[in-house]
A protein has these predicted regions:
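PLP-dependent amino-acid enzyme catalytic core
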Residues: 1-325
Length: 325
C-alpha cells in the first residue's frame, strides 16, 4: 500500500464505510458509571466495541476492506498478518462474503485469539515472532494465491472502517470534548481523528499507549517515526509499531498520546470489570488508565472512551479455571 497522505481516507469515505458495513457490523452501545465519573472528575462515556462482532472494533475495518473488493478480487481471497484481533476480524468478515482468508500468526500469540481465527474459518499460517517474518510469509501467500493483502492498520479501507466507531460515538453522545482510544499500529486513533475532523466539532482526540511500547509517543515527540523500540507490555494488542500513514495523520490532526504503565492498565481493567460489569482485555483498559493517571487533562470534560476489545484468554483468569487465591 502507498503510504502517501493522498492515499488515505477522508470523512466521505468514513461515511461510505459506515453504510457498507451496516448490514454486518453492530452499532455498539454506550455505557456510563457515576462511580467512575466521581473518581475521575469527568463525564465518561464508554463506547462498547468489545461487544462488536469478533469481540473488537477491528471487525469494522476488516469488514469495510472485504466488502470494498471487486468480485474478481474477492474471489481470490484475502491475507493478513495478525497476533489476534485483526486476524479474527478479517476471518469473520471474509466469512460474511463467502471468501477465503489466510492469517499469518506469530509464534507465541494468545491461544484464545488464534482459536477464534480458526473458528471463523481462516487458514492459520504460523511464523517466527518478527515483523520481517510476518511480512515475508504474507507476501508469499499473496503471490501464490492471489489473495489481497489487508494490512491491520495502514490499509485505507481499514482506517476508514475503524473511523466509524468514533462517528457513531459522536452521534450517540452530544457535546463531547475528548475522545480517547488505545494506540498500537494506529488504525483506530487515526480513523477517529479523521472522523472528528470531518464532524465539524471541536473534539480533541487522545491516544492511550503503554509506556512499554511508546513508539507513537516518541515518534510525535521527536517528529519522525521511531522504529527501534522493542515492546514490553501486557497489552498484546498494542505491541505493533505505529504505521507511517497513521503517524502522519496523528501529526496532521494534533492527536496527543498519553502513556500508562501496565500496573495502571491492570488496575483500570479491574475497575471496568467491577463497575461496568463487563469483560475487557488489557489493551482496551489503557483508555481509562490514561484518564486516571492524567486527571488534569480530563477533569471537568465530557470524555468518550473507546473500549476496543474484550477477547480475554479465560484460561489465564483464576476464577475461570477453578484456581484458588
Amino acid at each position: 500500500m502507498s503510504e502517501k497522505m493522498d492515499a488515505l481516507p477522508d470523512i466521505e469515505q468514513i461515511h461510505a464505510a459506515a453504510a457498507r458495513i451496516a448490514p454486518h457490523a453492530r452499532v455498539t452501545p454506550v455505557m456510563c458509571s457515576a462511580v467512575l465519573d466521581a473518581l475521575t472528575g469527568a463525564e465518561l462515556y464508554f463506547k462498547c466495541e468489545h461487544l462488536q462482532r469478533g469481540g473488537a472494533f477491528k471487525f469494522r475495518g476488516a469488514c469495510n476492506a472485504v466488502w470494498s473488493l471487486t468480485d474478481e478480487e474477492a474471489a481470490k481471497g484475502v491475507v493478513t498478518h495478525s497476533s489476534g484481533n485483526h486476524g479474527a476480524a478479517l476471518a469473520l468478515a471474509a466469512r460474511t462474503r463467502g471468501i477465503a482468508a489466510h492469517v499469518v500468526v506469530p509464534a507465541g500469540a494468545v491461544r484464545s485469539k488464534v482459536a477464534a481465527i480458526r473458528t471463523y474459518g481462516a487458514t492459520v499460517h504460523e511464523c517466527a515472532p518478527t515483523q520481517a517474518a510476518r511480512d515475508a510469509m504474507a507476501a508469499d501467500i499473496g503471490q501464490r494465491t492471489g489473495a489481497r493483502m489487508v494490512h491491520p492498520f495502514t490499509d485505507p479501507a481499514v482506517i476508514a472502517g475503524q473511523g466509524t466507531a468514533a462517528l457513531e460515538l459522536i452521534r450517540e453522545v452530544g457535546g463531547l470534548d475528548i475522545i480517547v482510544t488505545p494506540v498500537g499500529g494506529g488504525g483506530l486513533v487515526s480513523g477517529s481523528a479523521l472522523a472528528v475532523a470531518g464532524s465539524g466539532q471541536r473534539i480533541h482526540v487522545i491516544g492511550a499507549e503503554p509506556s512499554g511500547a511508546a513508539d507513537a509517543y516518541e515518534s510525535l515527540r521527536r517528529g519522525s517515526r521511531v522504529l527501534e523500540i522493542v515492546p514490553d507490555t501486557i497489552c498484546d494488542g498494542l505491541r505493533a509499531t505505529i504505521g507511517q500513514p497513521n503517524f502522519e495523520l496523528l501529526r496532521a490532526h494534533d492527536v496527543q498520546v498519553l502513556l500508562v504503565d501496565d500496573a495502571e492498565t491492570m488496575a483500570a481493567m479491574r475497575l471496568v470489570w467491577e463497575r461496568l460489569k463487563i469483560l475487557i482485555e488489557p489493551s482496551c483498559a489503557t483508555v481509562l488508565a490514561a484518564v486516571l493517571r492524567h486527571r488534569e487533562v480530563f477533569a471537568g470534560h465530557r470524555v468518550g472512551l473507546v473500549l476496543s476489545g474484550g477477547n480475554v484468554d479465560l484460561d489465564e483468569i483464576r476464577f475461570a479455571t477453578g484456581a484458588s487465591r
